[in-house]
Amino acid sequence: MKVTLIAILTCAAVLVLRTTAAEELEAESQLMEVGMPDTELAAVDEERLFECSVSCEIEKEGNKDCKKKKCKGGWKCKFNMCVKV
């Protein structure tokens, strides 16, 4: 009776561990597929750099400081560029 119980518990533990490992692998593969290609990220960075430098230049011509709030989404304006915060 004890041997059967130990065998059942061992099989259950192995099954749980294999299922958990399979779920982790599936989650990792999905994370790798979701990301943006590097070329798209570079284009976004260039757009943010341009937007920030233009907005800073407009503010400087009016003898005002650059508005730090122009860059959004985790970016801030620094040295006439959008910098990731």
Curated annotation (Swiss-Prot):
Disulfide linkage: 52-66, 56-77, 71-82
PROSITE patterns: HWTX_2
Keyword Zinc carried by entry: no
Transmembrane segments: none
GO molecular function: toxin activity
Localization terms from the record: Secreted
Signal peptide: 1-22
This protein's UniProt keywords: Disulfide bond, Neurotoxin, Postsynaptic neurotoxin, Secreted, Signal, Toxin
Propiece residue ranges: 23-48
Pfam family, one: Toxin_20
Superkingdom to which the source organism belongs: Eukaryota
Main location: secreted
A GO cellular-component term linked to this record: host cell postsynaptic membrane
Tissues showing expression: Expressed by the venom gland.
Family assignment from sequence similarity: Belongs to the neurotoxin 12 (Hwtx-2) family. 02 (Hwtx-2) subfamily.
Entry function: Neurotoxin active on both insects and mammals.
Self-association state and partner proteins as the record states: Monomer.
Name of protein: U4-theraphotoxin-Hhn1a
